[in-house]
Amino acid sequence: MLMPKKVKHRKVQRGRMKGKATRGNSIAYGDYAIQATECAWITNNQIESARIAINRYIRRGGKLWIKIFPDKPVTEKPAETRMGSGKGSPEYWVAVVKPGRILFELSGVPEETAREAMRLASHKLPIKTKFVTKRDFEEVGGESDEG
């Protein structure tokens, strides 16, 4: 499972998810990727399920990069416990994902294979996603340089 080896603070506040992703919103390594279109917490189990779905579909070919990491602990109190008496214990880890964030990148496979693999992975995730290619970002980058 994905989780940090060591953390400065064992418990953190929930925080707010507002705005768009300012970092990690372009393809860095692969040719194809899935991009988040809404915000959510994605757990380490969901990331692992999506990774397995992609790897099973592409089999031996291609290389996969996971661009998100669950570094936020989520605490839960035991069932049937009265309110108060402190914050619960950390139960699982989540990655905070904002719209525009690249979740997975893939290369070394045909576009149709990548599209289907990413579709299978997106069914394992709790958010809406869209399939993007490196060409999409090059076109956008080319237009902004000229204008």
Swiss-Prot record:
Query: Its Gene Ontology biological processes?
Result: translation
InterPro entries, A to Z? Ribosomal_uL16, Ribosomal_uL16_bact-type, Ribosomal_uL16_CS, Ribosomal_uL16_dom, Ribosomal_uL16_sf
UniProt GO cellular component terms: cytosolic large ribosomal subunit
Gene Ontology molecular functions: rRNA binding; structural constituent of ribosome; tRNA binding
Q: Where is this region: Disordered?
A: 1-20
What PROSITE patterns does the database record attribute to this sequence? RIBOSOMAL_L16_1, RIBOSOMAL_L16_2
- Pfam families associated with the record: Ribosomal_L16
Q: Does the keyword tRNA-binding apply?
A: yes
The UniProt keywords, alphabetically, are: Ribonucleoprotein, Ribosomal protein, RNA-binding, rRNA-binding, tRNA-binding
Family of this protein: Belongs to the universal ribosomal protein uL16 family.
Purpose of the protein: Binds 23S rRNA and is also seen to make contacts with the A and possibly P site tRNAs.
State whether it acts alone or in a complex, and with which partners, per the record: Part of the 50S ribosomal subunit.
List the NCBIfam families hit by this protein, alphabetically.
rplP_bact
Q: What is this protein called?
A: Large ribosomal subunit protein uL16
Q: Which organism is it from?
A: Clostridium kluyveri (strain ATCC 8527 / DSM 555 / NBRC 12016 / NCIMB 10680 / K1)
**Gene behind this chain?**
rplP
